[in-house]
Curated annotation (Swiss-Prot):
Biased composition (Pro residues): 23-34, 295-304, 1129-1141, 1210-1220, 1328-1342, 1374-1386, 1393-1433
Residue spans of biased composition, Basic and acidic residues class: 751-766, 869-886, 904-939, 972-1065, 1077-1086, 1164-1174
Domain annotation EH: ranges: 173-261, 453-542
A GO CC annotation given for this chain: plasma membrane
Organism for this UniProt entry: Ajellomyces capsulatus (strain NAm1 / WU24)
The entry's keywords: Actin-binding, Cell membrane, Coiled coil, Cytoplasm, Cytoskeleton, Endocytosis, Endosome, Membrane, Repeat
Protein name, entry field: Actin cytoskeleton-regulatory complex protein PAN1
Position of the signal peptide: none
Role according to the record: Component of the PAN1 actin cytoskeleton-regulatory complex required for the internalization of endosomes during actin-coupled endocytosis. The complex links the site of endocytosis to the cell membrane-associated actin cytoskeleton. Mediates uptake of external molecules and vacuolar degradation of plasma membrane proteins. Plays a role in the proper organization of the cell membrane-associated actin cytoskeleton and promotes its destabilization.
Chain intervals with Low complexity compositional bias: 35-56, 75-88, 305-320, 940-953, 1142-1151, 1343-1355
Length: 1481
């Protein structure tokens, strides 16, 4: 049916399916007769030729009214058949139908009704619809409106508008236009001119504007509008109505969108062929929609029979009947000849004859003559009445499987075949991006290739095969098949099926097979796994059959020859297999009596012939040797056909890769262009954020449509209005069209650059193709025919010769190969030796080594007198390279030039000259060396120089250099009789060569040895340099380290000197303090003498002192309370020098000062001097301060009561806050001593030391919040404080970098020791210490008191001022007993475990101690009350003999303490005593 025609276009398939579907008689007009003949001839598969008379089924009734309107409306038909003009008026339609018995299936009334419909039906022919072209329609707008003539459209497939957005109108407007367009066109695809005019005239625009709008809208110039054109017209009307000017030319973007949508609609309509003749195709879909007002024209009624057989029988009979009845009214006898054309179809023709009775035909054919003119003109050219029925049957005998290329088109036609042809035709600028849209369908496609398909495919093939090569290469086929839009996998399978021989190219039949498979795939058929018989091309089938026939013939011939023995006969190829003429076998073979003309004309058995043959073979060997030894033998052309064929195959493989490379380049160019556009969009959006944010594209692919711009403008206006109302500045917005303009400019530039690159790529492709063609021409065997090739291969490759000759040829080839290999090896070695010797001659010190003459023949160049094959190839290559360089230069590319502009001939000549010069120089050097050698030999032997000259002639190297190539001259080799001379000369030549080789080998060995020695020397020098550099670096490092060490030593020396000076100053102060302390001690002893003491208390005192005696004496560490207690001047027991456990910097100084026994201050002075002289304590403190920690600070709280027990006898105890000092166990500040020595040293140096007996020093403890009055009341409060004011001050100075020590928290554990009367507790604890020591020495030894540090003396002075002995005594236990000084020079030594070291004072724990307290012997003196336990532990207990009434004094003191007398808290600077106390050295 004709539903797939564009505008009612080509209806090339009015098949039976269409007739079966349309039972009522449709009335569209017929196409011209010639075209209809072409269209209908291939349509009917069973009887293709019978479709011709189809036009005249119902013409008598259908064209009755055409008599009046036919002359004016269809002048063409009027001219064709003027003789039938008067006939239309006389034929009633009823008679016409009665004349066709086969049509009696319908009632006459129905036929008549249909006929009336046909009479009133308008013509769908475009010329009859409007009668105007596109230009006429445009001009009609400017003329007054005329009543429109309704016309009928042809496209009956329904208006199908693609789902595509037009960017120049809004979506709402597009929907409205679609609705209006569909209502106007109905089921058609296009809006005719009159209807479009009516619609456009409603806009009330002037005619000139409407004319311009029509010109701009009708882009196809077809006189009708498709939907995109109609939408464009409405858009232009809207522009004019809004007061804008119409553009003179459509913008490119709008034109592209409209044209692309027009193309989509056109491709969507199958078989779109918008040609005017095709508009006459009848329309079967809506016969009732025709307008009766249209003038009638000759129409082609369709048959009403449901049977195709009846239809065909009518169709075949009527043409002949009309043809014979062309004159008009004919008697029935005229109708009889109709049967003559169809003798085999009498069954179908006989009923039709009744319709042509004499009564009906004269009346029935009076009127219908107007439809007849097309038939004689269309079929009268080459058809006879008999041919119309049977001739097509003979010409088209297919429809049978396997008959390839002669199958008629199917009944449903071949949809989209023309669209496929248009798509696949060569078109510029169609690189890719193809889809199957517009090509796919679901039609019924036969396996075999139809005639129409074959015709179209052949046209495609010829269009692509521009050079008429007869085949299409792989690159072109890829481009053609890729345009179909199919998947790559399907195309690969189709190619495999189409190219069964894997030749990489397709001939015409194979191309048709590929296109047919593509067409089937587009219509939904799968690609088969192998070709069916219907699709095997005739050329391939015939060729395969021919090959099979030849193979069978050869096999049969071989079998027959083998069975009959004829295979031994000489064949036509000239190859002889006869063995009776062989050199090695006799005449025992069956063909002994026959002669083989292809071998020799002579008899091989004859002695003369055999000797002659052997002589010839020997001559051939010698000639081959001459050829091999010739200097130019290396350039002998050894090109063979096999090599050329391999080169051609390689060239073909490279040529096949070219399309893929070009395609990849184009793809990369497209991707680069897209990437550049995308990058520009991003950059533009970043540079103009307002424009980017304002418009958001809603069109296809995110494009910005006109509606988007309108919305953006409205939104911008609203924002500006809102900003104005709010008083804000209006937002800055970019021009709406600026972004689009920038994008268009960038797109244009990118497109231009891409086009330039594409042109460059095409130029490169053309250059490569031209180069390929030149190489192919050079590789072709132009000057060799088959005979010469056969002869050459026969004697060079030993094909078709006897075994003896074949073995001889193989021997010659092996000898040639061996000689060539040897020559190549010698050439390479000689070139190396020449280069090495030349280097040695230049670099050696005068003694040159003999150089073996080079072989010029190894580097000779071929003569170019006659260009050989290789030279032709080289010349072609140079020409192609030159052309490529020129094209690249024209394209702006810089070719990679080697810098040498010389041609091949010039380069060869230059190389030849250089070789000659090198050879001459080498010969001259050889001659000089030989003369020098002969001269030295002559001088050594003292012989005449003539002898040297004679000896010099013996091995002349220069002649050997020339003679190497000419030693065995070709003339001598050609003389067969001079074999001995040739052999002798050859032996001499070989001897010379051996001598030269030996000499060269010796030279090479010597040169290698020299090179090895040179390399070894260089390596040794390099190693020595590296060693020297390493030594230099080591020395530099040593010097640097020595400088650093010297600086450190100098710094240490300066520090030691400074410390020594400071120590001397401190010692002087300490001596003054000791003197003051001694005076204080004497005064206290006098006080103690006056006191009444109980004996028990006197006894207890020494008991407590004894265990402390065992501990190493650290009298300097005893608190000041002990000094108050030691009022009797009794001499204490000799005790070990006290060690101050607290002050890290002053520890060793105090230790040195108090290292001697406490009794004698002189010894203390001597020891201090010895310490200062012997060593610098800071060096030892660095290494040992961390390790040596005084155990006194870690004494458990249980040991605290021990001093309390001794304090019963001692003077009043110190203030209550002292006990917490003794209780600090875990906070030993000496743990961090090593890290804080420097800071403590500076702090101690800055801290002021109290004077020995000044009141100022005694008043300082009270200033430090240790008042005497509140000793008892503030004992608990003192636990919370780290120490007295001076302790805090020192701690802040000495331990500023450290956190507050833990003793603050640990002091809470000793509240009982702070009690005002610790004497009662002390006896209980005193039981634990060891028994009392022996009686103290006489009181005449108060020396130990003098050993107390000045700080202790100051504290004693303070105690005297306060007169509160009990408080003083209580303070004694608070004093930390300094640990015994270790023998090591460390500032603190561990005390022996036997003596419980008294707890350290809180000042120790809290901060650095003040200056060292007075020595502990005062507290331990027996004359007075017993000193507190810490001093007893630090110093030896003073014997009771020291004080005459020591026991009584102690008892009185104890009684007063028991009576409740409060002990004054004496601010004994035990901390300073501990800090000053040093280790015993």
């Amino acid at each position: 049916m004709y539903s797939n025609t564009f505008y009612g276009g080509s209806s090339s398939r009015p098949g039976p399916t269409g007739f079966g579907q349309q039972q009522p008689p449709p009335p569209p007009p017929p196409p011209p007769p010639q075209q209809q003949q072409q269209q209908q001839q291939p349509q009917q598969q069973p009887f293709p030729g019978f479709s011709q008379p189809q036009q005249q089924n119902l013409q008598p009734g259908a064209f009755m009214p055409q008599a009046t309107g036919f002359a004016g409306s269809n002048p063409m038909q009027q001219m064709q058949m003027p003789m039938q003009q008067p006939q239309p008026t006389g034929f009633p339609p009823s008679h016409q139908f009665t004349g066709f018995p086969l049509q009696n299936q319908q009632p006459p009334s129905a036929v008549t009704a249909v006929t009336q419909q046909q009479l009133s039906a308008p013509l769908p022919n475009p010329p009859h619809e409007t009668g105007m072209t596109s230009t006429q329609i445009a001009h009609s707008f400017a003329q007054p409106a005329t009543p429109a003539v309704p016309a009928q459209q042809h496209a009956s497939s329904g208006s199908k508008i693609p789902n595509m957005r037009l960017s120049f109108i809004t979506a709402q407007d597009q929907a409205k236009f679609e609705q209006l367009f569909k209502s106007a066109v109905g089921n058609n695809q296009a809006l005719d001119g009159e209807t479009a005019k009516d619609l456009l005239m409603r806009s009330k625009l002037p005619g000139s504007d409407l004319s311009n709008i029509w010109v701009l809208s009708d882009t196809t110039k077809s006189g009708r509008l498709l939907f995109p054109e109609f939408a464009l017209a409405m858009y232009l009307c809207n522009l004019k109505l809004t007061g804008k000017e119409l553009p003179s030319v459509l913008p490119e973007r709008i034109a592209n969108e409209v044209s692309s949508m027009v193309d989509i609609i056109s491709f969507a309509v199958p078989d779109a062929r918008p040609a005017p003749p095709q508009t006459n195709v009848p329309k079967f879909d809506a016969p009732l929609m025709q307008n009766a007002s249209a003038p009638p024209a000759p129409q082609q009624p369709q048959p009403q029979q449901p049977s195709n057989t009846q239809l065909l029988s009518q169709l075949t009979s009527q043409p002949t009947g009309f043809y014979n009845q062309a004159t008009g009214l004919q008697p029935p006898s005229i109708v009889q000849p109709q049967q003559t054309g169809f003798p085999a179809q009498n069954a179908g023709l006989r009923p039709q004859q009744t319709g042509f009775l004499s009564n009906t035909q004269p009346t029935g054919y009076n009127g219908p003559r107007p439809p007849m003119p097309p038939m004689p003109t269309g079929y009268g050219s080459g058809l006879s009445p008999s041919q119309t029925g049977l001739a097509p049957l003979n010409a088209q005998p297919t429809g049978v499987p396997g008959q390839w290329g002669f199958v008629n088109a199917p009944a449903t036609g071949l949809p989209n075949i023309e669209a496929l042809q248009q798509r696949l035709m060569p078109q510029p600028g169609r690189e890719g991006g193809f889809t199957t849209q517009g090509l796919s369908g679901n039609a019924t496609i036969p396996w075999a290739v139809t005639k129409d398909e074959k015709k179209i495919y052949d046209q495609l093939f010829r269009a692509w095969d521009g050079f008429n090569k007869g085949f299409i290469g792989g690159d072109v086929a890829i481009e053609i098949m890729g345009q179909s839009g199919l998947e790559r996998q399907d195309l690969e399978r189709i190619w495999t099926l189409s190219d069964p021989n894997n030749r990489g190219r397709l001939n015409m039949d194979e191309f048709a097979v590929a296109m047919h498979l593509i067409y089937r795939k587009l219509n939904g058929y799968p690609v088969p796994n192998r070709l069916p018989p219907e699709l095997i091309p005739p050329s391939t089938r015939n060729f395969n059959d021919s090959i099979g026939t030849v193979k069978s013939l050869l096999s049969q011939d071989a079998e027959s020859r083998k069975s009959s023995g004829a295979f031994l006969q000489p064949q036509q190829t000239g190859v002889s297999y006869l063995k009776n003429h062989s050199f090695r076998s006799g005449s025992s073979t069956p063909g002994a009596g026959r002669k083989d003309a292809t071998v020799f004309k002579n008899n091989d058995d004859a002695i003369g012939d055999r000797r002659e043959a052997e002589s010839l073979m020997e001559r051939i060997r010698r000639v081959q040797d001459d050829i091999d030894t010739d200097p130019k033998a290396a350039f002998r052309i050894t090109d063979s056909g096999a090599e050329r064929r391999s080169l051609r195959r390689q060239l073909q493989s490279y040529q096949d890769q070219l399309p893929e490379l070009a395609s990849n380049v184009r793809k990369v160019e497209r991707s680069i262009a897209d990437a550049r556009l995308e990058l520009f969009r991003l950059k533009d959006a970043k540079a103009h954020p307002s424009a980017a944010a304002a418009i958001v594209g809603t069109g296809p692919g995110g494009t910005v449509t006109e509606s988007d711009r309108i919305k953006a403008r409205a939104r911008a206006r609203m924002q500006a209005r809102a900003a104005e109302l709010a008083g804000r500045p209006p937002p800055s917005t970019d021009d709406d069209g600026a972004a689009a303009r920038r994008l268009e400019e960038e797109t244009a530039s990118v497109k231009a650059e891409r086009e330039r690159n594409d042109a460059m790529t095409r130029d490169v492709e053309e250059s490569v193709k031209e180069f390929t063609r030149s190489l192919e021409d050079s590789l072709k065997d132009v000057d060799e025919n088959s005979t010469r090739e056969h002869e050459r291969r026969r004697w060079e490759e030993a094909l078709g010769v006897e075994d003896t000759i074949r073995d001889f040829i193989y021997d010659l080839q092996r000898a040639s190969r061996t000689a060539r290999v040897r020559k190549d090896e010698r050439t390479a070695s000689s070139q190396r030796s020449v280069s090495n010797n030349r280097y040695d001659n230049v670099s050696s010190n005068g003694d040159t080594l003999p150089v073996r003459p080079s072989q010029p023949q190894s580097t000779g160049s071929p003569s170019l007198a006659g260009l050989t094959h290789q030279e032709r190839v080289t010349s072609a290559k140079e020409r192609a390279q030159k052309r490529i360089a020129e094209r690249m230069a024209a394209a702006g590319l810089k070719p990679n030039s080697d810098g040498s502009g010389e041609t091949l001939l010039e380069r060869q000549e230059r190389e030849k000259r250089e070789r000659e010069e090198r050879r001459k120089r080498a010969e001259e050097e050889d001659a000089k060396r030989e003369q020098e050698r002969q001269r030295r030999i002559a001088e050594e032997q003292n012989g005449p120089p003539v002898k040297a000259a004679t000896t010099g002639k013996k091995p002349p190297p220069p002649p050997s250099r020339k003679g190497k190539a000419d030693g065995v001259s070709p003339a001598e080799t050609r003389k067969l009789g001079d074999l001995k001379n040739a052999a002798r000369e050859k032996a001499e030549h070989e001897g010379k060569e051996r001598a030269l080789r030996e000499e060269q080998l010796a030279q090479e060995a010597e040169s290698r040895r020299l090179e090895a020695e040179a390399r070894q020397q260089e390596e040794e020098l390099a190693r020595e340099r590296e060693a020297a550099q390493a030594r230099l670096r080591a020395l530099e490092e040593q010097v640097r380290q020595g400088k650093i060490k010297k600086q450190e030593e100098k710094r240490r020396k300066q520090l030691a000197e400074k410390e020594a000076k400071e120590k001397e100053a401190r010692l002087a102060i300490q001596r003054a303090e000791l003197e003051a302390a001694q005076a204080r001690e004497r005064e206290l002893q006098r006080q103690l003498e006056g006191l009444d003491e109980e004996e028990s208390s006197d006894d207890e005192g020494p008991v407590e002192v004894t265990p402390q005696n065992s501990t190493p004496t650290q009298s300097a560490v005893l608190p000041s309370a002990t000094t108050t207690m030691a009022s009797p001047p009794s001499v204490p027991r000799p005790a070990t020098p006290p060690a101050a456990p607290f002050e890290p910097e002053l520890a060793f100084e105090v230790a040195s000062a108090t290292s001697t026994s406490i009794p004698s201050p002189e010894s203390v002075k001597q020891r201090v001097a010895a310490d200062t002289e012997s060593r610098n304590p800071y060096f030892r403190k660095m290494g040992q301060s961390v390790d040596t920690q005084p155990p006194s600070f870690h004494t458990p709280p249980e040991q605290i009561p021990d001093p309390l027990s001794t304090t019963e006898v001692a003077p009043p105890p110190a203030s209550a806050p002292a006990p917490p000092k003794t209780e600090i166990q875990s906070t030993n500040p000496f743990h961090r001593l090593a890290q804080q020595q420097e800071s403590q040293k500076s702090a101690f140096a800055a801290a002021p030391l109290p004077g020995p007996l000044t009141r100022k020093s005694r008043a300082r403890p009270e200033d430090d919040e240790w008042s005497i009055a509140e000793s008892e009341n503030s004992s608990d409060d003192d636990d919370d404080r780290p120490a007295g004011g001076s302790a805090k001050h020192l701690a802040s100075i000495l331990f500023g970098t450290m956190g507050p020590p833990r003793p603050l928290s640990a002091m809470d554990e000793k509240p009982e020791s702070k009690s005002a009367t610790p004497v009662q507790e002390s006896p209980t604890v005193a039981a634990s210490p060891p028994p009392p020591p022996p009686p103290p020495p006489p009181p005449s030894e108060p020396a130990p008191v003098t050993t107390l540090p000045p700080a202790v003396a100051a504290q004693d002075v303070e105690e005297d001022d306060d007169d509160d002995d009990e408080n003083d005594f209580q303070d004694a236990p608070s004093m930390p007993p300094p640990p015994p000084p270790p023998p090591v020079p460390a500032p603190f030594a561990d005390a022996p475990p036997t003596a419980p070291p008294p707890p350290p004072p809180p000042a120790f724990s809290a901060a650095a101690p003040p200056p060292p307290p007075p020595p502990p012997p005062v507290g331990g003196a027996p004359g007075g009350p017993p000193p507190p336990p810490p001093p007893a532990g630090d110093a030896p207990a003073i014997p009771k003999a020291a004080v005459p009434d020591a026991g009584a004094g102690r008892g009185a003191l104890l009684a007063s303490i028991q009576a409740g007398k409060g002990l004054r808290k004496v601010e004994t600077k035990d901390r300073s005593a501990a800090s000053v106390s040093g280790r015993v050295l």
